[in-house]
């Protein structure tokens, strides 16, 4: 019999990408469905998802395309961008990413698929890299304690304003910003200040703080160093004057300039902020980049964001961990120091490694070359009669050309260079690591000047004041001197990566975190220079490909969520929350309802919800959670009635943080609307809804999404992320905008949330590609398989562990909660013991003690195949059997594989005095010696690290293996 001939059209399609993204194949799905008692995915989700929220129609999205087709489309979009020499400045500069860092960090899934290092024993490589970053920032700024990254320079400055108000002695008065500060930073500060009643005053501080401002009281001062105009001036007198007024002083500093200039700490600053973008991180049309903040020691315990510290493990060996977590949003909620959750870990690692790679001498060489080009450029312009405004500068010139500025900028553009049009009479020109002689000549030609670079190089003097030159050594730690050769650097990066656990090793079943596949085809384009080398303030006609991609992504996200408008500017989920709440606030105020400031939040909500609400000027009122995991309807109704006239918004997560589809969500939304409030649906769990239900259609007025969860941007070990905000039409006028790019948002918007007009635009091609690869039907099936996987795990584990919550049909959504409290009470085995024992079996722990203390929240996602799901279930069942050995007395309660977990290879050497064997410790059932992941340290003493806070690199002898 002749086999059936396959048509060419079918052969051309190949294997659909959907089958690459979704882990379980059709046969595996059938087995899983049988386990949970359903015949098809449609039957399962029909039973799990409440009828009242179901979408009647399929997603109206372009049909799925192959990887080759999508990459070709991306290439076509990239080709529509024009990358000119980026001499605009304003905090964004051309930089050269060392290929060893590009290939082995930015393009390496061992780095970019990891999660925030809440499990420090399996995050030691990443934590060491972040400690390098903190040490680099601390040494260059001259301040002893640096955090592990913030979102960008603008938000770092806004966080500094909040910190100044929180820790300073002056509790009232104004926040004073020098007029020569980056304009986007000023705008972000003003956006952040207004809801909390902080008055921001922008003034020229070149001659000190004006008396009329000093008389009003000043709680904080921000100085740019060097200034946005490029000016380098002595800021120490202003710092001294501010301190006399009791103000906290923040200096927004350029790290490359600080290799040559006196540090902010040496000048007396209390806080330093900025961006590390020019340390090897592509501009990416605005991001992502790692912002930074460093502070005096007395403010360390009030820092926003993550802070890596040095502690010890159970054997007394040096180990790293996240320090002082009790000040963060996931614990302190509305009392947190900040709403920052996702930061910019991957980019911080890159920037820190850039300093490791170049060392102090290499960085100074780059700085001197950049400055030399600026000085040569200035002398050439002066020789042609052009007025260079400032005599002292580092890399940026401002020149006065009355009435000619626009023409000069246009002429430079014709010659392949982008300059900054300051106003009709002034042009600004910034040099950077990538500046070339030909670019200098092109700029001269645009001004009608010419020069001899060799002759000027021999004659030109530095334009940095002698009194402001740095005299102390920088980057003195051995880590910045040991890895000069690429061989050494490559091996260092490999050594650190091998210490960590990321998705390239195995499943990371963190509930509410959606650790799904980050496909290589989705990632590939972000390193293309047509996307990566584009300046965020480049003219719109040079960014047509990027702007088209952004518009299409916003439209497709609106279709997925059921909203009318989407802004992708927020560069983290927390910032999307803030943007959405600001839109709600602005809407109420536009209607004359200024008194509507109460934000109702269920007790089970993400910690960022409450922290963001406080930042948006709202009063948080907590709503109880019922025993079944849903919002307590009676308590909610009572709170609505109690605050009817002041109700601004209800924030709910859907499906709930308890992993269930709440049946009453539409009813809840209706009652809030009847009381005059808005409904904010937190999109953290959108992976359970895509293609099945739309928040904007079942009662939501506003939601943020997490592109680093649902839409495949990798978590990067703690960032980057993107938190777009979607709104219904009545809130659309109040989305974020930007003063330097009018197209970035509505004229009536609330101001910028992020420093860049389109936030972390450089990683948006990832989500664009995911949606394009999957199509509407593929996205729906991904959701259905995610729900199937969670229910499969729940069914397999239910005979061994209590499953805390489920819906009316006995089903969970995309995650399930395993309750360890009865087991812990009966046996003394803690949730920490189980989490650390999972490491011995080769797993990252699920989410611990959220939203309920003493539980594990498991989210497998659609990307894990059946073999991995079964390996996890088998492991949990094996651990349950180990717990029984403790309960029965076979193993001592204080000496067993759980209480001593994790076990390192080093622990196997020497005497073994435990009541269980070495094999039981490190090769429990199902663990292969050939594939074993060995944690580099034993259980870490968190309390020791917080009591003895050390947040920079230990001395060299501490690195001995």
Swiss-Prot record:
A GO-annotated cellular component: cytosol
UniProtKB keywords: Oxidoreductase, Pyridoxal phosphate
Gene3D superfamilies: Aspartate Aminotransferase, domain 1, Type I PLP-dependent aspartate aminotransferase-like (Major domain)
UniProt key word Oxidoreductase: yes
Stretch forming the signal peptide: none
Catalytic activity reported: N(6)-[(R)-lipoyl]-L-lysyl-[glycine-cleavage complex H protein] + glycine + H(+) = N(6)-[(R)-S(8)-aminomethyldihydrolipoyl]-L-lysyl-[glycine-cleavage complex H protein] + CO2
Requisite cofactors: pyridoxal 5'-phosphate
Oxidoreductase found in the keyword field: yes
InterPro entries linked: GcvP, GDC-P_C, GDC-P_N, GDC_P, PyrdxlP-dep_Trfase, PyrdxlP-dep_Trfase_major, PyrdxlP-dep_Trfase_small
SUPFAM superfamilies: PLP-dependent transferases (SSF53383)
Single GO MF annotation: pyridoxal phosphate binding
EC number: 1.4.4.2
Superkingdom: Bacteria
GO BP of this protein: biosynthetic process; glycine decarboxylation via glycine cleavage system
Modification type N6-(pyridoxal phosphate)lysine: residues: 709
Family: Belongs to the GcvP family.
NCBIfam families in the record: gcvP, PRK00451.1, PRK04366.1
Its biological purpose: The glycine cleavage system catalyzes the degradation of glycine. The P protein binds the alpha-amino group of glycine through its pyridoxal phosphate cofactor; CO(2) is released and the remaining methylamine moiety is then transferred to the lipoamide cofactor of the H protein.
Oligomeric and partner information: The glycine cleavage system is composed of four proteins: P, T, L and H.
Record's protein name: Glycine dehydrogenase (decarboxylating)
Organism (species): Streptomyces griseus subsp. griseus (strain JCM 4626 / CBS 651.72 / NBRC 13350 / KCC S-0626 / ISP 5235)
Source species taxonomy: Bacteria, Bacillati, Actinomycetota, Actinomycetes, Kitasatosporales
Gene (UniProt): gcvP
